[in-house]
Amino acid sequence: MSKKIMATQKVVIASLNPAKINAVKSAFQSAFPQQVFEFVGISVPSEVADQPMTNEETHRGALNRVKNAKLEMPTADFYVGLEAGIEGNVTFAWMVIESDTHRGESRSASLMLPPEVLAQLADANELGDVMDKVFGTENIKQKGGAISLLTQNQLTRSSVYHQALILALIPFTNPDHFPANL
């Protein structure tokens, strides 16, 4: 009996951040264990502030990253935009995944930020830079993120993003229940 060979599918990740890339790889491999993927990280503009400060702006940043990734590499099977943001005293991220026919979206869990961090963000710094300054770390945003610091490494940026990405993949893992929406 011959084994069905599946064509490799290309996933373009609109980021060069290792934590984001690892989360995308992990989620796709978990959701589609029989599928072979080629993952490509690219840098594209979000067209929002470096540190989005509302839920709406953060969501728009993830959508824009997907749009710009499609323009940059128009022949991929999937495009993934991830955008972290802040609203009030919490930080979170939006995940947007698109194919030619479908879009899936999800927002990650939110975590409270310390008052000292929030006060320094008023100076328009990125959260990762402020966390490095307050906690004495270096480049935390490309490692475990603020969440690893605040949960004593019980959770990481990648682990939280992984869950949100699995949720954003629902239209793709359940195609019979989700008609084309693009």
UniProtKB/Swiss-Prot annotation:
Cofactor: binding details: Binds 1 divalent metal cation per subunit; can use either Mg(2+) or Mn(2+).
SUPFAM superfamilies for the chain: ITPase-like
EC number of the protein: 3.6.1.73
Family designation: Belongs to the YjjX NTPase family.
Presence of the UniProt keyword Metal-binding in the record: yes
The reaction(s) this protein catalyses: XTP + H2O = XDP + phosphate + H(+); ITP + H2O = IDP + phosphate + H(+)
Protein name according to UniProt: Inosine/xanthosine triphosphatase
